[in-house]
Amino acid sequence: MEFTSVNKIFEAAFKKNWLRPAISNYQGETLHFRDVARRMEKLHIMFEECGLQKRDKVAICSRNQANWAVSFLATMTYGAVPVPLLHEFKSANIHHLVNHSEAKILFVDEVIWEGLSESEMPDIQAIIQVNTFKILYAADPKI
């Protein structure tokens, strides 16, 4: 097999399977490849607006769900580095790991967000609610 970039492999897979189911929430919503691609595109726009650069880190701290995978894929295809964090970690551990990883963006469940403080993560540019992709915090008020 000829080597190609990961993005080219994903692009071919998404085009080929556009109308097929891709990922599902347990006993819930099923996302088709087209849905995943559109959500990834929206996240790429958000990443750009937040000033995310290639090789920057993006932490993801959420229960297993379809949007966790979308966040991971969007981060990877943008050229950033996904940093998965267990949702069972205590707030202090999440703060420490986000800071230690030098993450610029953090995806979180709303329940996890309730126990966190953006002031404990000074390098974070944005915190995004993983279920809805709503921006919960942005260092730049214009975002």
Predicted segments — roles?
Residues 1-2, 104:
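A general boundary/transition motif marking the beginning of the first structured unit of a protein
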Residues 9, 50, 77-143:
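Structural core segment of the AMP-binding/adenylate-forming
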Residues 2, 11, 19-69, 73, ...:
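Conserved AMP-binding/adenylate-forming core of the ANL superfamily
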